[in-house]
Design a protein with these regions (language model features):
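Positively charged n-region of N-terminal signal peptides that target proteins for export
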Residues: 1-5
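Domain-level marker for long, solvent-exposed, non-transmembrane regions
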Residues: 17-281
Length: 281
């Protein structure tokens, strides 16, 4: 029953993003999840207690503001936990994973309790104070990404360096773009790419755990002018069209395109360095 509730909440949250110009950002009434910039931001508000007349009125006002700020921050933390639970990890929500593993749940709750303040405190017209808190997805990934199944750190650079260095700079491929603008794809922290024969083209075994945590396997953007494109895949990426996204999280490309990516990986180490980006609607 719990899993059904989480799935429903995740579905409702994604509805906020469907018509948004930035569908890599899932917005709710309590904040947003930004898969492109790998950050989760929550917001909390609280009423400012009316000023009381007193000989020491100034100190009373300071005390009241302090209480209101504390209440707003507490609400923002509660909202943050709710947002974290609907983050799409790999087709599973973080909340589903927490429900299955009490240790993971405790670690994530600790992470949420250490969320940092995002921006300045806002003082609203209706006598309210608002505070935003943020958690980086790298912190969430540190907890959720398994230690096993990834490329060994020691061999992650050795296989392609000679080939890349012997290729003229003008001919080097700098990254891979998967164009998913014609299909429905839900962003995730660790999605995979398969070909039409259901063979894995890109997944944890292609990159190290540290890169998965710190960089994320894939970037997201909505057009080629987005600054994330240059930062993630450089100036000369190859562009591959996604065929489908049957489970809405993992992407499928053609067999021919999967061979092109494998060849580019052997020569330039694009997958090893997580130089992969998905274009969304």
């Amino acid at each position: 029953m719990y899993n059904y509730v989480l799935t429903y909440l995740f579905f409702i949250a994604t509805l906020f993003a469907i018509d948004s110009p930035r569908s890599s950002v899932v917005r709710t009434g309590s904040g947003f999840i930004d898969y492109s910039n790998r950050v989760i931001v929550s917001r909390g508000t609280a009423s400012i207690i009316p000023k009381e007349k007193s000989r020491d009125g100034f100190k009373v006002i300071e005390k009241n503001l302090k209480i209101s700020k504390g209440e707003a921050k507490s609400q923002a933390r509660d909202n943050m936990l709710g947002l974290v639970k609907i983050v799409n990890f790999d087709g599973r929500t973080v909340g589903e994973i927490m429900h299955e593993d009490p240790l993971t749940q405790r670690r994530i709750e600790t992470l949420v309790s250490s969320a940092y303040q995002q921006g300045e405190i806002e003082y609203l017209e209706r006598q309210e104070v608002a505070i935003a808190l943020a958690v980086k997805m790298s912190g969430l990934a540190e907890i959720l990404v398994d230690a096993g199944g990834h490329l060994n750190e020691d061999v992650s650079q050795s296989t392609f360096l000679m080939t890349r260095n012997s290729t003229p700079k003008s001919e080097r491929v700098s990254g891979v773009i998967i164009d998913a603008r014609n299909i429905y794809h839900v962003p995730a922290m660790v999605p995979k790419i398969f070909n039409e024969e259901d063979k894995l083209v890109y997944g944890p075994r292609h990159y190290t755990r540290s890169r998965s945590i710190n960089r994320g396997p894939m970037g997201y953007a909505h057009n080629m002018d987005d600054g994330n494109v240059r930062r993630r895949v450089g100036k000369n990426p190859i562009i591959i069209e996604a065929v489908t996204s049957e489970d809405n999280t993992n992407l499928t490309i053609s067999k021919i395109d999967s061979d092109i990516i494998r060849d580019a990986e052997k020569r330039f180490g694009l997958l090893t360095n997580c130089k992969v980006l998905v274009l969304l609607k």
